[in-house]
From Swiss-Prot:
It comes from Psychrobacter sp. (strain PRwf-1). The keyword Repeat does not apply. SUPFAM superfamilies: Ribosomal protein L13. The keyword Ribosomal protein applies. This is Large ribosomal subunit protein uL13. This protein is one of the early assembly proteins of the 50S ribosomal subunit, although it is not seen to bind rRNA by itself. It is important during the early stages of 50S assembly. Keywords: Ribonucleoprotein, Ribosomal protein.
Length: 142
């Protein structure tokens, strides 16, 4: 008996919608990362993109535990000497609410061409409105 390996042509990608309101950042991010990779499917193959599309709404209402709202730091670098910038969770959620969940999920995905293609299947929105009604996403309770 041979191990079945999924072919890219025979993989189906479903659309799911997740409401992030009141959900804990890390716990939600791990579930999303696993679904984006396709690890929940029996046909999971590490070198083939078998994951689903995930639409996240209310990304601005995501929660963190403890004092992480003030203490959690996010860094970025301009590429120039001395060009490192630092911000905390509260400031980042106020200016770019989608960026918080994007950084959390992106860090959990593999680096390389497959990981870069996988992160493109994550659609993040701060409010309840999203332009993906035509795909008829199914409600996913995480």
């Amino acid at each position: 008996m041979k191990t079945q390996s999924a072919k890219p042509a025979e993989v189906t990608h479903d659309w799911y919608i997740v409401d992030a309101e009141g959900k804990t950042l890390g716990r939600l991010a791990t579930q999303i990362a696993a679904r984006l990779r396709g690890k929940h499917k029996p046909s999971f193959t590490p070198h083939v993109d078998t994951g689903d599309y995930i639409v996240v709404i209310n990304a601005d209402k995501i929660a963190v535990t403890g004092k992480k709202a003030q203490d959690k730091k996010y860094y970025r670098h301009s590429g120039y000497p001395g060009g490192i910038k630092e911000t905390n969770f509260t400031k980042l959620i106020a200016h770019k609410p989608e960026e918080v969940l994007l950084k959390a999920v992106k860090g959990m995905l593999p680096k390389g061409p497959l990981g870069y293609a996988t992160i493109k299947k994550l659609k993040l929105y701060a409010g309840t409105e999203h332009p993906h009604a035509a795909q008829q996403p199914k409600e996913l309770d995480i």
